Amino acid sequence: MTNESERGAEPTQGQRYSPAEIEPKWQARWDADTGLYAAEAAGDVSQKDGAKAKFYCLEMLPYPSGQLHMGHVRNYAIGDALARYMWMTGHNVLHPMGWDAFGLPAENAALKNNTPPREWTLGNIAAMRKQMRRMGLSYDWATEITTCLPDYYRWNQWFFLKMYERGLAYRKKSKVNWCPQCQTVLANEQVIGGYCWRHEDTPVEQRDLTQWFLRITQYADELLDGLTTMEGWPEKVRTMQANWIGRSEGAFVEFRVAWEGEADPSAALRDDNKKGDDDREGLGREAGPSTPLRFAQDDNQKNNGAGVITVFTTRVDTIFGATSVQLAPEHPVAKGFAETDERLAGEIEEMIAQQTLAREAGDIGGIEKHGVATGRFAVNPFNGERVPIWIANYILADYGTGAIMSVPAHDERDFEFATKYGLEIRRVVAPNVDEDEAGLRLPYMGEDEGVLVDSGEWTGESCLEAQEKMAAFAKAGGFGTPTVTYRLKDWGVSRQRYWGTPIPMVYCERGHAGVAGGPDVEAGGVVPLPESALPVILPEQVEITQEGGSPLGRVPEFVNTTCPVCGGPARRETDTMDTFVDSSWYFYRYTDAKNDRAPFDSAKANYWFPIDQYIGGVEHAILHLIYSRFWTKVMRDLGLIENSEPAERLFTQGMVIKDGAKMSKSKGNVVSPDDMIAQYGADATRMYALFAAPPDRDLEWQEDGVAGVSRFLARVYRIVTKYARAVRSAGIGEARAATLSAAEGDVLRVLHQTVAKIELDFSGRWHFNTCISSIMILVNAIIDREGAIDAGEVSAPVLSEVFRSLVLLLAPFAPFLAAELWEQMGGEGVVFRTPFPRPDAELAREAEAEIPVQINGKLVTVVTVPAGSDEEAMKAAAMGDEKVQARIAGKTVVKTIVVTGKLVNLVVR
């Protein structure tokens, strides 16, 4: 490890601050010292007595687009400042970097530039790595990972096989999100308002495809419950994930489709209980018995094969108020009706088109509600009542069961639909069973405080009590099941692209009928490859076109293979994995990046995990951040790790904007970090990114601000180099005199106030902007006392303490300048491996305090007292003030209120 003081540089008083000379010099030295940023080995550290506390600091790995942008600079400057501070406070720090290197842009570049994706990607990585080095970022490049290389993606394939063994990876035909511009499938999380997450102007289409899925829903409850313990994650992220998981408790209930001409056996019962439609809307009248009227469900001839409609409801307690059943236009029962009804078929086709347009516009929730009566009826299993079946354009086939029971009196959406089409609105929930219905506005939800009316044997019960009882009743009757549903769907990971991880499955042409002793094989000859066959390597000679389907399917040498079970001919899977697979576990690989026998060594991962501080954008809340939580739980269940969550703390930084908008090439407001570094230096560029705004807020980029920070650093350089020789001569550890001069006391007070402020801000507050502001105040305090220093009023020990501390305080934010000044002052060792200054509370205490004095609550004057004065001293100072004496002359002070260190208030008459 480099010892900066051994370079022997002499102070350079009189020279101007030149980052163009300083920064390349230090980066060359740091590059030559390959172990400079290396963490101590987990096995060595964990066994030592009094071992350093570990600190895993990680910024989200970037996609290698070829150029860093200012958002990257801000993200990495935050992590770098934290990592350097943790080194200086005695931690064993892991601070790695890698590349999320698979993805569509490489294929687009291949089309545009006729450059192979691998060549384009690796070239971009080299360019961005060079930029990161130029920024002076403290990454341990020995742990670097690149997800598009076989030594990484073979473990994606290994995990896929392990999930397949456990039933967590499976294949099915389903309706998927299709981006016509990407020519591939998108996961639900990658559809933003009906548009592709990559192409914000491209509407997403719905297609039926056979895809591979990962069973993330098996972990839905744990993913949701875990959010309550993740106090180190932003509330916004936790809320977004909870909403995305979307847990709903309720029941599945079966409504049998009535055969044509079937009588309504509940009509007489309703007539006995109510006379006329007007009475039906009343409250408080008890209904008759609720014995479920069950009918044979195998009478397919009379039933036209329509069978049963299953609905999911969170309010089974309102089922006596169901006045229709509504189907999505793509529901199988709706399609069955349409086979013999051309009018209905036309309506369904039109509704599907409406839904498609609404999805494309990202406004499926705002679609104008439209429905059509089928002329058919469903039977309410709780009372045998026949209710009309409608097809409605706002019911979605892929949400819930694609069917609802409509209870317009107690659901806003149902109320709107029923009002439009004149459907019956029947009240079955009231605020109080004895309360007059006058003034009750519909729809009325009443789940928390409502009671049931006109609901058979459950009349008079609270809604919450009835929900549990009625769900159990449905289960006992064989027409329902209490259940929990989720908005979260299984993760579709198949992508019809080339530049991704090959899926390690083959399709045997023999289908394996009668193969003895072979592994379990799905119908149709789906066979997992053995681990010995990994990695399945991407072929390099692939024609990238804009045609649909996977490019790998056009490479016979890749597609045609042999079955690992029977040795017969087989075809490889030609889809590749979603690139979010790569980023779901990458941070574990950093702990053991060169392991060729396993994804990582469990002991090393268990030492470093969970990540102590993870840093990245909030836009990843329901993509990367939820997938990585799922992957962590799977790895735990595989016995690879002990932790259940990947990161203890998450910080989501704000965006960098310019001219009021996020930087983008299309807006012409992109600022190049290279240009800023060339003009102002890396220290000024990254320090401005930390200073201009609190890190969790958006930052409005102003080049004048970078210039201002550069001028500040020049002032630091001037004042430190002026006294560097004196500091070098003073050495370290010489005791201060017992009595300090006024100049010494003043500058030490500001110094230790600054140290205390920075220590507080690094303890989780993340107020780097105020850290830097405090350093600026300290520098101003030193410069203000430059004359006193020149006059010898500041002793050598104090001078050494002040200037060495200043440079150490600066080190996390401006590492190049700190290293240069540390060397010039003769500092020992590496500046950011030197212990960070500790605050001295006595020295930080103000010498004097200004105390407002009030008379009858109105400010009269301000008096100065020694810091720490007691009540009597404060009272004496107030009473001795000339303005106070003039105001109270001839009056009586009836009460004196003293707030120690804050205020004196005299009450006079």
Predicted regions and their residues:
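Intrinsic disorder/low-complexity segments
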Residues: 1-9, 256-308, 512-523, 726-738
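Residue patterns forming the tRNA-binding/recognition surfaces of aminoacyl-tRNA synthetases
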Residues: 2-6, 16, 24-25, 29-37, ...
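Conserved oxyanion/phosphate-binding beta-strand-loop segments in alpha/beta enzyme cores
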Residues: 3, 7-58, 87-96, 119-129, ...
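Glycine- and acidic
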Residues: 7-13, 60-68, 110, 140-145, ...
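NTP-handling and nucleic-acid-processing catalytic cores
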Residues: 15-27, 31, 156-262, 301-430, ...
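N-terminal catalytic cores of NTP/NDP-binding nucleotidyl/phosphoryl-transfer enzymes
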Residues: 44-115, 144-159, 313-314, 381-417, ...
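Helix-rich, typically C-terminal accessory recognition domains appended to large enzymatic cores
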Residues: 100, 165-166, 170-177, 247, ...
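Alpha-helical recognition segments enriched in aromatics with Gly/Pro capping
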Residues: 376-382, 386-399, 553, 559-695
